[in-house]
């Protein structure tokens, strides 16, 4: 076997043994600090004080109990797909984003209307 073919086979074997690439683990977030950042940076104008969503400048998604993984959440803050302002690393650190993520994960989320007594009388 030629030297080039041996190197190629070795590289392929190394890649196979390395396993699949995984997303970097999210920094551990602090929900209490996340609430402070969420309120201080005005996230609530569009997303509501408890992440319930809203329509301040067009429809804003519900953030409470979001099923979006951290990397997607961070990506949306860094390079938003909609009319949301972008938050560069100079404006908001990855740790602050992790804190906001922890905060919105701590919110109760939507309740089933059938579980609200006043709506069912």
Residue ranges and their predicted role:
Residues 1-9:
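Bacterial N-terminal signal peptides that target proteins for export
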Residues 2, 28-32:
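Juxtamembrane/transmembrane-helix boundary motifs in multi-pass membrane proteins
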Residues 8-16:
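Bacterial N-terminal signal peptides
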Residues 19-23:
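Sec/Tat signal peptide C-region and signal peptidase I cleavage site
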Residues 24-29, 40-41, 49, 86-121:
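Flexible coil segments in periplasmic/lumen-exposed cytochrome c-class electron-transfer proteins
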Residues 31, 35, 39, 48-86:
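Gly/Gly-Pro-rich "capping" loops immediately C-terminal to redox-active cysteine motifs
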Residues 45:
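Short, cysteine/histidine-rich loop/knuckle motifs that typically chelate Zn2+
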């Amino acid at each position: 076997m030629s030297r080039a073919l041996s190197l190629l086979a070795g590289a392929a074997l190394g890649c196979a043994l390395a396993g699949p690439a995984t997303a970097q683990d999210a920094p551990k977030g602090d929900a209490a600090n996340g609430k402070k950042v969420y309120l201080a940076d005005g996230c609530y104008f569009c997303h509501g004080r408890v992440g319930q969503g809203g329509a301040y400048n067009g429809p804003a998604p519900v953030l409470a109990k979001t099923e979006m993984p951290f990397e997607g959440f961070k990506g949306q803050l860094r390079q938003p797909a909609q009319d949301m302002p972008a938050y560069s690393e100079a404006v908001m650190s990855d740790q602050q984003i992790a804190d906001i993520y922890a905060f919105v994960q701590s919110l109760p989320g939507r309740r089933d209307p059938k579980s609200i007594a006043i709506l069912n009388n």
